[in-house]
């Protein structure tokens, strides 16, 4: 299961050794897991109500992500009521953005979002 996350969407977007290392590290906790919550999550996306989100939001999707389609995420994005929001599609990445070969694109995007200066709502003449 864990190994397949790195090969399921677009083989070649991550180093196979990363998937192997992660799977090996996780295997010490056992080699079987209940699928209920995972299947529930993927079958019932989205798992949050976009109308209830009030904080700044960054949605990042890898070009080859096989979990949620671009259309799924755009539909979610357009339902958001928070004005401080961004939607980014990163090229050359699949679902595991932070572990892919092009992970620097993900980390750059995250840093830019977190470093975004606050919004100015009005000019005050001093």
Predicted regions and their residues:
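Alpha/beta-hydrolase
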Residues: 1-58
